[in-house]
Amino acid sequence: MSDILNTILARKADEVAERSARVPLAELIARSADLPLTRGFAAAMQASIAAGDPAVIAEVKKASPSKGVIRPDFQPADIAVSYEFGGATCLSVLTDVDFFQGSDAYLRQARDACTLPVLRKDFTVDPYQVYEARVLGADCILLIVSALEDAQLADLSGLAMQLGLDVLVEVHDIDELERAVQVPVPLIGINNRNLRTFEVTLQTTLDMRAAVPRDRVLVTESGIVTQADVQLMRSHDVNAFLVGETFMRAAEPGESLRQLFFAHD
């Protein structure tokens, strides 16, 4: 399979140039100056875990490069309401247009419809996108270690924290994890999907979890489909989850979430 991530990153560089030509960075910086406080993404995750509950980041995702359109009848506001009712701790909303058929408008619609903190799920490679996320109303951004140099990781995470945004730093292997723990953010995501091949195995999280510092929240991402998957993770003290496709294929995403994570309660 072709290297999807490199293709996406090349497009992101062009996208940033196009967007900054329309809305200059100086304007975004000015607009980010006096915004309300964010909803506290990391704090919400920590609170759910402290209460003994699974901390679920429920994803609002229409499509993906590997699966095509996942949810043809895609209503972000309705999905957000359903997720909140189903017990989600936070939301993740895809805003990448070209590869995931996402939209900035989807993030606004989802966030306005609920009280949950929201992650802007995109490929952040430039400070422009961090300011953009804050202005859009995001509470957290994603930084993918395999897409960034160490200096970029430090600069982008530092800028995000300066703007009041939380950061989820995503890794896929132990070398990336060693780089990620140098970034002083509380959320580390282990993606069970290899972003270069899009293949998935839960063993990725199990193999790496012991190397995640105890003061960080380990979020397992991708491949959580059954209650047995959830129980496997929780039996290994992995209590934070990012789940998208499983819910997006259900008629009622929030009910699917409740069944997967809370049906035993």
Swiss-Prot record:
Q: Name one GO molecular function term.
A: phosphoribosylanthranilate isomerase activity
EC number(s) on record?
4.1.1.48
**Swiss-Prot/TrEMBL catalytic activity:** 1-(2-carboxyphenylamino)-1-deoxy-D-ribulose 5-phosphate + H(+) = (1S,2R)-1-C-(indol-3-yl)glycerol 3-phosphate + CO2 + H2O
Enzyme class, UniProt record, top EC level: lyase
* Keywords attached to this entry: Amino-acid biosynthesis, Aromatic amino acid biosynthesis, Decarboxylase, Lyase, Tryptophan biosynthesis
Q: What does the record give as its pathway?
A: Amino-acid biosynthesis; L-tryptophan biosynthesis; L-tryptophan from chorismate: step 4/5
Checking CDD domains in the record gives:
IGPS
Q: Indicate yes or no for the key word Lyase.
A: yes
User: Which BP terms in the Gene Ontology apply to this protein?
Assistant: L-tryptophan biosynthetic process
Among HAMAP family, the record links this protein to: IGPS_B
Family note: Belongs to the TrpC family.
**Name recorded for this polypeptide:** Indole-3-glycerol phosphate synthase
